[in-house]
């Protein structure tokens, strides 16, 4: 497995990436000599990889137990963490146990929060099985779950000891999840690493059929992009906030859809909304909006708010965005990450955030929720009166 040292200010952990490397993953976990391996995954991943990993660990590493939770965003709740904690303790977990987060971003957050809470903190190792997890969520110290008021509102910061990623696990992903992952890849290219845009445009596949070599490049570039902004901001409260590009509206869409819209799909729409808002405010050109639409389409993602989502619900959840409080912002506005060009982030002082009137943001959301056959283009939007 190829290893990259992920350095965040005063802390560091190894990110190991390979293909067809299940045996090495078990060997690496075995080196930790855990009293018990607590393999956390959802019920879908349990059938695909969880039971096999537990059996391999039992054979070659030490005692292991499978802790499962129901699949889906609606189960990313503090109650799920509590249930898993009870399962772990009943199975004999102690301070020398290791939590193995086997799954996507939802499981990674649930397991990460679990590891931070058991005995006030035990070892956490990520074994990501989705694109979003491999190139985004496992590279963050943020461990959070949802509340009734919005996404990722309850959580903490906790460092994994290691990440062990096998791209072969992506072969069992449905196309929906692969496309979702590409939403985060497009974000990295547009907001952080514009040097990857040209090749990314050539590598993206609307049918979500990716060769191993292309996927390895996509993951490696995205890991480098994220490390570029978290190296000096491990808590993602300064420059690291750029990783929230597209997430203001994206999270609101996800929450309004009650788990029916994948994370990366929501982010893709959120980025187009953000580009439209930047254009309306006079910071960006229509070309930037067009580039967003082009890359989102090449990834096989929708460029408009899904019909199953009520735009009024989206606008409601925008008022609970988790970036509120980072900067002074009137009640009728919300802080957003906006671009003036690829890789060029607008700032208010030292932060990559600008206040956006909720009325203007709401009009951009409405424009992307146009009925089929009706344009949601720039002609339907005009700047708010001065």
Curated annotation (Swiss-Prot):
Keywords: Antibiotic biosynthesis, Cobalt, Lyase, Metal-binding, NAD. It catalyses: D-glucose 6-phosphate = 2-deoxy-L-scyllo-inosose + phosphate. SUPFAM superfamilies: Dehydroquinate synthase-like. Its cofactor is NAD(+); Co(2+). GO terms for molecular function: 3-dehydroquinate synthase activity; metal ion binding. CDD domains: DOIS (cd08197). GO terms for biological process: antibiotic biosynthetic process; aromatic amino acid family biosynthetic process. Gene3D superfamilies: 3.40.50.1970, Dehydroquinate synthase-like - alpha domain. Pathway: Metabolic intermediate biosynthesis; 2-deoxystreptamine biosynthesis; 2-deoxystreptamine from D-glucose 6-phosphate: step 1/4; Antibiotic biosynthesis; paromomycin biosynthesis. Its EC number is 4.2.3.124. InterPro entries: Dehydroquinate_synthase, DHQ_synth_fam, DHQS/DOIS_N, DHQS_C. Co(2+) binds at residues 184, 247, 263. The keyword Cell division does not apply. The active site is at 142, 244. NAD(+) binds at residues 42, 73-76, 105-109, 129-130, 140-142, 151-152. Binds 1 Co(2+) ion per subunit. Catalyzes the intramolecular carbocycle formation from D-glucose-6-phosphate to 2-deoxy-scyllo-inosose (DOI). Belongs to the sugar phosphate cyclases superfamily. DOI synthase family. This is 2-deoxy-scyllo-inosose synthase. It comes from Streptomyces paromomycinus (Streptomyces rimosus subsp. paromomycinus).
């Amino acid at each position: 497995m190829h290893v990259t040292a992920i350095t965040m200010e005063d802390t560091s952990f190894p990110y190991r990436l390979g293909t067809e490397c299940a045996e090495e993953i078990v060997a690496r976990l075995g080196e930790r000599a855990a009293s018990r391996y607590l393999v956390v995954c959802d019920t879908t991943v349990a059938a695909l990889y969880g039971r096999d990993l537990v059996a391999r660990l039992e054979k070659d590493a030490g005692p292991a137990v499978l802790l499962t939770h129901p699949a889906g965003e609606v189960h990313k709740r503090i109650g799920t963490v509590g249930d898993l904690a009870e399962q772990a303790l009943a199975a004999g977990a102690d301070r020398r146990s290791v939590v193995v987060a086997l799954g996507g971003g939802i499981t990674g957050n649930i397991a990460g929060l679990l590891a931070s809470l058991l005995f006030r903190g035990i070892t956490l190792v990520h074994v990501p099985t989705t694109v979003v997890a491999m190139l985004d969520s496992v590279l963050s110290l943020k461990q959070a779950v949802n509340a009734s008021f919005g996404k990722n509102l309850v959580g903490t910061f906790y460092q994994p000891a290691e990440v062990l990623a096998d791209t072969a696990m992506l072969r069992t992903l449905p196309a929906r999840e692969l496309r979702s992952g590409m939403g985060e890849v497009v974000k990295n290219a547009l907001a952080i690493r514009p040097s990857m845009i040209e090749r990314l445009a050539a590598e993206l596949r609307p049918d979500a059929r990716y060769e191993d070599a292309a996927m390895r490049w996509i993951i490696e570039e995205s890991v480098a992009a994220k490390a570029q902004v978290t190296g000096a901001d491990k808590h993602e409260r300064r420059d690291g906030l750029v990783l929230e590009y597209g997430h203001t509206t994206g999270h609101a869409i996800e929450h309004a859809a009650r788990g029916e819209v994948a994370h990366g799909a929501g982010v893709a729409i959120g980025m187009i909304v953000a580009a439209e808002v930047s254009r309306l405010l006079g910071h960006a050109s229509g070309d930037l909006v067009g580039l967003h639409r082009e890359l989102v389409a090449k990834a096989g993602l929708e460029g408009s708010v899904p019909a199953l989502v009520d735009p009024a619900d989206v606008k409601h959840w925008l008022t609970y965005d988790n970036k509120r409080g980072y900067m002074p912002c009137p009640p009728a506005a919300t802080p957003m990450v906006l671009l003036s060009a690829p890789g060029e982030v607008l700032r208010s002082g030292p932060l990559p955030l600008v206040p956006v009137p909720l009325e203007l943001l709401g009009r951009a959301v409405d424009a992307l929720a146009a009925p089929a056959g009706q344009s949601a283009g720039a002609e339907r939007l005009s700047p708010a009166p001065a």
